[in-house]
């Protein structure tokens, strides 16, 4: 997959070069992707959605190489290791990456909250047990299909002095891994007066009752993954409740509700899924700079490829930054609230930026000539676009991610942290030019100032412009923040690369190349921020008037941002010339 310098640069960008275990995981996943996944794609494995022997062979290869047991084999956090495996597999096919991840998604809540007995039984991968996480879409009691989809539990049998038996009724939709799952972690809600609240409960095929793996789901992408609509009507002991339960006045009360159990799981996996999607962008660019890659024809617009490359690097940087922070959080026994909130925000922002960028950029790339993979498959970019659109729905659609980001970005602690980030970057910008740092900090200050103004603006009735009900205001500001966070993460990664370039003996051109890419990413982010801030601040002027003082302050900030764009177009041209020269090698 790599040009001679590509891996070294990116391992250092993402802070994994010094971790032999992480590099080994990435190389293992790459080997499986090339030797097990790619041949199946060439043979037409994406042509059908049913679970076949050929797809089972891919799963067996993932098992044999330890890629389905990463969760139980690392002591330094699991998000970065899973992210690297997903990156390499999604480079070839998103469905293969889903095969690797879905079991971990189900097991994470057991790892975080399970009893010792549950961990011993369900996290021991010596016999390669596979798991599935069965939620409604997305959680019990939520969504337009809540009545049809949500699951429930009640006491089925309760002999005094013995453990209660629970009756579980659950219907799932679009559930991965069900064709071969050895157990299922299902979200259910209590619906009688003998049980209280919601929980996650572990189900096994041998339990009394109906364990129906469900009908096959017809999908436009991720065909290598198993996906069905399962049905469960089972009796299980109450000890299967993840995290155990308490007896209060004769009522079964789970120790944790399903939202608490899934919170760290979703935090990690939003970062991981963002990296799966970002991988698709760079997999389109990389063949153009690999002299041995098989590309044909001349791309119609090199500048568009520059935009795609910069977006892919920024998406990957934000995703890996969120994964590292998630690992740091997991390794702390009592993490601060500030760190927890920041990790949740970055994970949601990473997923939103990756999915929203990938679908647009890959749609443009589909019109280019010359961007074919090493196997020459004509459906290469089309398949990646379809997979990216499906990934945009995992763990909640883009609207949900925007809602999470817009709610978190007005937190006082985060806004203080955001100001600190801006000041830190300004100090770097005084030392280094040509990276677009000044441009990025101007955009960050404009966004922060505009957010404050929007939150203060009211109409004649005292109604605030910035409120949950007015998503036409909150969502564009959330999108703008995600672009800024992605550009910031990429800038910090490039600064890290500059620190170690001499020590790692990286090619001299990589610094200037990634400086230019960082400048392009910052320019793109600042342009979208300036447009969104102007539209939101003045676009509601008829009902939310803006004072002359506010207009002057905004004009001053935007003028500084415009001047800071100096050199960004030249950086874009230099990258385009580099791509053209590499393509002609």
How should each PLM-predicted stretch be described?
Residues 1-101, 121, 560, 564-585:
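Amphipathic, small/basic residue-rich leader segments at the start of a protein or domain
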Residues 56-128, 177-180, 312, 316-319, ...:
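Internal helix-loop-helix
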Residues 118, 277-284, 288-334, 340-373, ...:
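Extended, hydrophobic alpha-helical segments in both membrane/secreted and soluble proteins
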Residues 128-141:
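A short, Trp-centered hydrophobic/proline-enriched beta-strand micro-motif
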Residues 163-215:
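A short core secondary-structure module
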Residues 170, 337, 341-426, 513-585:
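Alpha-helix capping/hinge segments and adjacent helical runs
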Residues 216-313, 389-485:
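Glycine-rich beta->alpha junctions and the first turn(s) of the following alpha-helix
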Residues 435-585:
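C-terminal amphipathic alpha-helical interaction region
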């Amino acid at each position: 997959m790599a040009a001679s310098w590509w891996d070294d640069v990116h391992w250092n960008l993402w802070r994994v070069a010094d971790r032999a275990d992480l590099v080994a995981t990435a190389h293992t996943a790459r080997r499986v992707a090339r030797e097990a996944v790619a041949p199946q794609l060439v043979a037409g494995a994406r042509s059908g959605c049913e679970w076949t022997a050929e797809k089972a062979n891919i799963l067996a290869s993932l098992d044999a190489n330890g890629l389905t047991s990463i969760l139980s084999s690392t002591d330094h956090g699991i998000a970065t290791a899973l992210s690297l495996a997903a990156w390499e597999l999604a480079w070839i096919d998103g469905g293969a990456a889903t095969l690797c991840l879905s079991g971990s998604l189900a097991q994470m809540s057991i790892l975080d909250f399970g009893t010792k007995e549950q961990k011993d039984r369900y996290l021991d991968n010596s016999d390669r047990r596979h798991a599935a996480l069965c939620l409604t879409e997305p959680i019990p009691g939520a969504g337009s299909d809540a009545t049809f989809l949500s699951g429930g539990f009640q006491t089925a049998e309760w002999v005094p002095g013995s453990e209660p038996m629970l009756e579980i009724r659950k219907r799932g939709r679009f559930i991965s891994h069900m064709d071969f799952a050895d157990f299922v972690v299902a979200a259910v809600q209590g619906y009688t007066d003998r049980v209280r609240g919601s929980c996650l409960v572990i189900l096994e095929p041998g339990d009394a009752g109906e364990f129906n793996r469900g009908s096959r789901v017809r999908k436009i992408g991720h065909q290598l993954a198993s996906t069905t609509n399962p049905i469960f009507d089972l009796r299980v002991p109450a000890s299967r409740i993840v995290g155990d339960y308490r007896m209060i006045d004769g009522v079964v009360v789970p120790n944790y509700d399903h939202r608490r159990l899934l919170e760290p799981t979703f935090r990690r996996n939003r970062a991981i899924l963002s990296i799966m999607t970002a991988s698709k962008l760079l997999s389109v660019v990389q063949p153009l700079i690999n002299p041995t890659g098989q590309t044909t024809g001349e791309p119609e617009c090199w500048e568009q490829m520059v935009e795609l490359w910069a977006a892919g690097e920024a998406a990957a940087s934000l995703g890996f930054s969120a994964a590292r922070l998630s690992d740091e959080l997991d390794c702390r026994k009592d993490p601060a609230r500030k760190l927890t909130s920041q990790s949740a925000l970055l994970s949601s922002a990473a997923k939103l930026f990756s999915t929203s960028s990938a679908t647009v950029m890959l749609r443009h790339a589909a019109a280019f000539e010359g961007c074919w993979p090493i196997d020459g498959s004509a459906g290469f970019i089309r398949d990646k676009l379809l997979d990216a659109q499906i990934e945009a729905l995992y763990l909640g659609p883009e609207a949900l991610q925007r809602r999470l980001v817009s709610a978190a970005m007005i937190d006082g602690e985060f806004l203080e942290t955001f100001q600190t980030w801006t000041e830190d970057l300004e100090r770097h910008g005084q030392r280094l030019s040509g990276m677009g740092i000044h441009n990025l900090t101007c955009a960050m200050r404009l966004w922060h100032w505009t957010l404050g103004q929007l939150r203060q603006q009211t109409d004649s009735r005292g109604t605030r412009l910035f409120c949950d009900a007015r998503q036409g205001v909150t969502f564009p500001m959330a999108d703008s923040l995600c672009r800024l966070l992605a550009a910031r993460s990429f800038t910090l990664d490039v600064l890290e690369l500059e620190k170690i370039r001499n020590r790692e003996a990286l090619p001299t051109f990589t610094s200037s190349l990634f400086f230019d890419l960082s400048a392009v990413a910052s320019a793109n982010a600042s342009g979208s921020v300036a447009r969104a801030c102007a539209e939101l601040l003045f676009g509601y002027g008829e009902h939310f008037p803006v004072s002359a003082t506010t207009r002057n302050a905004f004009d001053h900030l935007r003028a500084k941002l415009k001047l800071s764009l100096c050199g960004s177009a030249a950086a874009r041209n230099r990258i385009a010339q580099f791509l053209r020269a590499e393509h002609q090698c």
